[in-house]
């Protein structure tokens, strides 16, 4: 099941069964629907997309290593908790021509649901015929959607990375610590995140990521190139910072030429699945004597 965009793209060798012409792009400046449902005593908190202040390089009051361990532990918690939620996911990718207009698109909307016995599955609700001509999605795309994102630096993954403190920055109403993240080594057939994370300075939780999946994969006859992307999170039910929006506007550099792309993933309607019912101890009830 695909869960969030990472962005592996393959230069398209001839693609069959494509329909001519691009599909309509989403409205300019469109934003995901509100999905925040915080506690009544907590004001909604959102990692804003564009409002930010200058970065202060003064050392934090809390030891850096303590911050890192704390936000990694919270990432692990968020990853596990999100597996208990249903939500709607909309994913689109467009190629952009030299005039800045879309000339091909892949789009899919799906609901992430559960069977009655609690097994998670993805139900596609809308998937127009793709019109991409210059690139295509690869299996690595789908794998990265699930494994590289949305939670980039859990306790389990932390030993694989170098994490460096950058400074403190205000993202609208959120104070955040910034860290640069890079894999210590690149192991064969392993995928990693490389980029920057913003950690909310009160509860020490990641609220924004900016980077890419690495490494790019170039073999004879194919090139998987990964764009840079930003992922923004919102506070869900007053407890969890879940991803709600990912975007990318990048140029992919292939050996045969550059391809400009625009990608977007929206997550909406987060709802926790399941109801806990407590059952008492069974007792024998004897029938009344006649």
Which functions belong to the PLM regions below?
Residues 1-19:
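Sec-dependent N-terminal signal peptides
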């Amino acid at each position: 099941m695909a869960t969030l965009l990472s962005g592996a793209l393959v230069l398209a060798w001839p693609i069959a069964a494509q329909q001519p012409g691009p599909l309509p792009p989403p409205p300019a400046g469109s934003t995901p629907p509100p999905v925040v449902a915080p506690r009544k005593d907590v004001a909604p908190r959102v990692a804003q997309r564009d409002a930010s202040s200058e970065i202060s390089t003064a050392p934090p009051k809390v030891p850096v290593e303590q911050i890192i361990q704390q936000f990694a532990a919270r990432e692990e918690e968020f990853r596990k908790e999100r597996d208990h939620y249903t939500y709607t996911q909309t994913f689109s990718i467009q190629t952009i021509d030299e005039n800045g207009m879309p000339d091909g698109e892949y789009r899919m909307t799906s609901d992430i649901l559960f069977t009655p016995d609690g097994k998670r599955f993805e139900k596609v609700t809308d998937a127009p015929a793709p019109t991409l001509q210059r690139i295509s999605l690869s299996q690595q795309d789908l794998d990265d959607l699930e494994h590289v994102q949305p939670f980039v630096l859990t306790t389990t993954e932390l030993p694989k990375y170098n994490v460096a403190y950058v400074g403190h920055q205000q993202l609208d109403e959120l104070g955040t610590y910034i860290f640069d993240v890079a894999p210590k080594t690149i192991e064969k057939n392993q995928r990693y995140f490389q980029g920057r994370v913003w950690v909310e300075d009160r509860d020490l939780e990641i609220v924004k990521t900016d980077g890419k999946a690495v490494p790019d994969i170039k073999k004879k006859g194919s090139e998987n190139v990964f764009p840079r992307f930003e992922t923004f999170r919102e506070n869900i039910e007053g407890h969890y910072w879940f991803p709600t929006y990912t975007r990318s506007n990048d140029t992919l550099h292939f050996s045969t030429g550059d391809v400009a792309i625009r990608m977007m993933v929206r997550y909406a309607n987060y709802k926790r699945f399941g109801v806990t019912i407590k059952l008492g101890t069974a007792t024998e009830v004897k029938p009344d004597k006649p």
